[in-house]
Design a protein with these regions (language model features):
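Active-site rim/loop-helix segments in enzyme catalytic domains that contact anionic ligands
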Residues: 2-129, 256
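Metal-dependent de-N-acetylase/amidase catalytic core
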Residues: 2-32, 113-261
Length: 261
């Protein structure tokens, strides 16, 4: 089987090569972003998703954990926090312009396990949603402390392999009526060895708006206790500008691109 099976767009045909880097995939038709927690997707690839959504792509979100540990408040009602974070994630997706599904798998925050059951579930989502491009955590990021981020990346990579091959997880056809599906490309954010960038110069404000939908994270992740997000916005703008500068861009998000799926 080739990397691009019939019906898939030649996504890399319009990617520009700059030495060891490629840039700006042809806007895909269907995209699946897979994050460990609510807000991980917006941090990792929010500008890219906003750009593709504006080009007509169907953007889907898949969040693996319930986000129940995402607070410094030791007395927090975790059930309420889970519900709140799901609401925030849906609102963030809307702000990116995403019109696809927002799915929550509900694994306990901090206890995400890279096992066959989770790989099966994510592979089923890939087969059902048929993304051209999948985006997720780089599981090989050195010194990555959070186990959910490492495991989410491994689950994503293993699920792509399971979803693409017809003899893996054959019960999906019998039970759900979905055949195998091979995405054309995988983009891993926070990449240990980045080799691809997307120009998001026109989408920084949209990324920020989506991040700011995660109001429960203002204190813990965004480092504000009074609702003043100016310092947080400055950090994000500076980070995107720093990533874009070597490529002559005002802002960029960078990834490790794997296109031999």
């Amino acid at each position: 089987m080739s990397a691009n099976e019939p019906g898939q767009p030649p996504l890399l045909s319009s990617a520009l090569s700059h030495g060891e880097w490629t840039s700006n995939l042809q806007p895909p038709h269907v995209v699946l972003a897979i994050g460990a927690h609510p807000d991980d997707i917006e941090f990792g690839c929010g500008g890219t998703l906003a750009k593709w959504a504006a080009s007509g792509a169907m953007i889907h979100h898949l969040v693996l954990t319930d986000g129940s540990k995402g607070t410094w408040d030791v007395d927090a009602d975790t059930a309420q926090l889970i519900e709140r974070r799901q609401h925030e994630q849906r609102r963030a997706a809307q702000r990116l312009g995403a019109t696809g599904e927002v799915r929550f798998l509900g694994a306990v925050d901090g206890e995400l396990v890279h096992d066959s059951s989770m790989v099966d579930t994510v592979a089923l989502a890939i087969r059902q949603l048929t993304p051209d491009v999948v985006l997720g955590h780089d599981p090989w990021k050195r010194y990555r402390l959070h186990p959910d981020h490492r495991n989410a990346g491994l689950i994503t990579c293993d699920a792509i392999v399971a979803a693409r091959d017809p003899h893996f997880l054959r019960h999906h056809m019998a039970t759900h009526g979905v055949p195998h599906h091979r995405p054309a490309a995988l983009l891993l954010w926070e990449a240990d060895e980045p080799n691809h960038y997307e120009d998001v110069s026109g989408w920084v404000d949209t990324k920020l708006a989506a991040l700011e939908a995660h109001e429960s994270q203002f204190e813990s992740t965004m480092k504000t206790t009074d609702g003043d997000l100016s310092a947080f916005r400055g950090r994000i703008r500076d980070r995107l500008a720093t990533l874009g500068a070597p490529h002559g861009l005002g802002a960029a998000e960078i990834f490790h691109l794997i296109d031999q799926l």
